[in-house]
């Protein structure tokens, strides 16, 4: 969930995702399989009223359009939609993207993806020792505008979850002993992002 930036009127636009169901490789009646992004415009005078609109969905373009939108970052002019494509749908035709939805034009396009280097043996020995070849084995996590924090315009951070990057050194990272996950991850800085 995130809201549009830029003005009080814009701030009443709230965007959120319905990631989609991942329990099956086939659609389930009454549910979105590939995922959706909605816009809720809150009424300026009545907080109990508003208008809900579907702005992006993947069910009409299975495997080529959006796949399991999970996180969202909204600026004044764009909605950045981060995919969590590790549902491993057999019809998926691309790895996880960050999509850029233009609020004014109402268009959605792939904006960023990760290079898995699946044919590079040395790379895979380090970052994909299990030789996972299905699309979506890496996902994008949260994306946040940090321009105002660091004083550099159009600068964002993005979390990356490469599920194939596993090492014993990553085990028990929080020290609790409760989690057996040993996946690595990164937070990266991206500059010159359109706002």
Per-region residue spans from a language model:
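Sequence/structural signature of beta-propeller domains
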Residues: 2-195
